[in-house]
């Protein structure tokens, strides 16, 4: 292998290490930003946000959906994993409030008996707009979805930051490997050349 290729290996290694350092810095900054943003919201898990208690509440509400297995009861939400956990509990709370129905499954308008309807003629009249009154259960679901999506986005952002850190470490190790291999080859080449020069001198001296 020629010397330019060996030097190219060293340069490539240095570039990979530089990219690795950059990726780690960006990843750490991203995770720190997620943590700071969540801390500013001062979100704390409610007392029932444990697997055991939410299972009892879900059973009483007649829910048959998958339940959270994490625990954030009384815990300040300051990282992506806890944000995702909190969002899962929020969804269960919303289902309890809507009788286990999602937004699309609920009637569009409110009725006097609370059952709801999608028929405008049977709906309660909104005193302000004089039109059919919207189903309040749907508003609960909209609020939960908006907040839950924001929390899930925080989890995704934190995961991307972690991925950047891992990739940065991998790039640094790869770059270091290139440098070690290239430096080793250069060292062996130098030794070989010095050995050849010495042998030539000895041969010349012997010939004289």
Regions found by a protein language model. Give the residues of each.
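Long, solvent-exposed extracytoplasmic domains/loops
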Residues: 45-142
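Membrane-interface extramembranous regions
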Residues: 25-30, 35-36, 152-160, 188-193
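Short, aromatic-rich amphipathic segments at membrane interfaces
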Residues: 126-171
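Residue-level marker of positions within ordered structural domains that often coincide
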Residues: 22, 95, 156
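Juxtamembrane interface at the cytosolic side of transmembrane helices
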Residues: 1-8, 157-208
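Residues that form generic nucleotide/phosphate-binding pockets
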Residues: 37, 89, 93, 150, ...
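Membrane-helix exit/juxtamembrane interface segments
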Residues: 22-55
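Hydrophobic secretory-pathway targeting helix
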Residues: 1-34, 173, 190
């Amino acid at each position: 292998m020629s010397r330019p290729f060996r030097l190219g290996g060293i340069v490539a290694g240095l570039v990979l290490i530089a990219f690795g350092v950059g990726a780690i810095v960006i990843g750490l900054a991203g995770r720190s930003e997620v943590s700071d943003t969540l801390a500013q919201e001062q979100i704390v898990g409610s007392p029932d946000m444990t697997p055991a208690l939410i299972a009892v509440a879900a059973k009483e509400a007649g829910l048959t959906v998958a339940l959270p297995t994490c625990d954030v009861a009384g815990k300040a939400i300051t990282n992506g994993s806890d944000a995702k956990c909190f969002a899962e509990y929020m969804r269960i709370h919303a289902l309890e409030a809507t009788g286990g129905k999602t937004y699309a499954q609920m009637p569009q308008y409110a009725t006097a008996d609370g059952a709801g309807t999608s028929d405008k003629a049977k709906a309660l009249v909104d005193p302000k707009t004089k039109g059919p009154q919207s189903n309040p259960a749907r508003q609960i679901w909209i609020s939960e979805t908006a907040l839950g999506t924001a929390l899930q986005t925080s989890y995704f952002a934190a995961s991307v930051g972690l991925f950047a850190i891992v990739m940065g470490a991998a790039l640094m190790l790869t770059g270091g490997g290139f440098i070690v291999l290239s430096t080793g080859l250069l060292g062996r080449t130098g030794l070989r050349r010095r050995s050849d020069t010495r042998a030539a001198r000895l041969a010349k001296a012997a010939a004289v």
